[in-house]
């Protein structure tokens, strides 16, 4: 079957983990593995397909993405706020544009981060070597400005649990920034966070990491707010 036209959205009865809902907004806990909106290669099974089944007449933005004012990566789990009215959409969009919203994530990264807290700054843009990745350009000659504040919550021998607060919202910001400082996200295949096993000869360590990958078979990133 041919995929539907890009602006033809089909309602699908997809179970949604609704955290909060009133007359103006709905907050959904998106599972890892779910794409937020239809696009090339993903024409069904997205969060938007489920939303338009749950709610009629969601407001649309210029990109024909009903209710959406922000998004998170397919393999990132966590909270998304969706506008149910035109007023809410305009208001929320302005808050994201003005950076007055608080966007907090939890991440597990490889290695032990020395500082208890810190800030990662550096422009983020499309990688010249791999177009599926974003790179950090600290000199500011390419990309767009990006700022990530982090705080260590717990050090766990091989990995560190961190809380990240975004001052900007660039594509793959947390993933690219932490790779840049040498602490790739746990099991982040696109940025090499799954390559820790390659060349490892310590069998017990190798088995431990493989067990961890089995428990969390995707990048360790969750949108808390």
Predicted feature descriptions by range:
Residues 3-6, 12-13, 110-111, 137-140, ...:
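Intrinsically disordered, low-complexity segments enriched in polar/charged residues with Gly/Pro
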Residues 4, 131, 203-207:
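Short, basic/low-complexity N-terminal boundary segments at the transition from targeting/disordered tails
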Residues 28, 176, 187:
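Active-site flanking residues adjacent to catalytic metal/cofactor-binding acidic residues
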Residues 62-94, 101-102, 106, 125-183, ...:
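The conserved catalytic core of RNA pseudouridine synthases
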Residues 73, 114, 142, 172, ...:
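Charge-rich, low-complexity amphipathic helices
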């Amino acid at each position: 079957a041919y995929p539907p036209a890009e602006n033809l959205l089909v309602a699908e009865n997809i179970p949604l983990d609704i955290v909060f809902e009133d007359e103006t907004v709905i907050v959904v806990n998106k599972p890892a593995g779910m794409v937020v909106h239809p696009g090339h290669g993903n024409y069904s099974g997205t969060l938007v397909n489920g939303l338009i089944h749950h709610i009629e007449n969601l407001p649309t933005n210029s990109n024909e993405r009903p209710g959406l004012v922000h998004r998170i990566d397919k393999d990132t789990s966590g909270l998304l706020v969706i506008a149910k009215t035109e007023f809410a959409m305009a208001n929320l969009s302005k808050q994201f544009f003005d950076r007055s919203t608080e966007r907090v994530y939890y991440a597990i990264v490889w290695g032990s981060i020395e500082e208890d807290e810190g800030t990662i700054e550096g422009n983020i843009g499309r990688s010249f070597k791999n177009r599926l990745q974003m790179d950090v350009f600290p000199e500011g000659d390419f990309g767009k400005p990006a700022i990530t504040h982090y705080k260590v919550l717990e050090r766990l021998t091989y990995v560190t649990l961190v809380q990240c607060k975004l001052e900007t919202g660039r594509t793959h910001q947390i993933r690219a920034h932490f790779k840049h400082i040498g602490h790739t996200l746990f099991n982040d295949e696109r940025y090499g966070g799954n390559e820790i096993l390659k060349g490892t000869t310590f069998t017990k360590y190798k088995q431990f990491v493989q067990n961890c990958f089995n428990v969390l078979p995707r990048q360790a990133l969750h949108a808390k707010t």
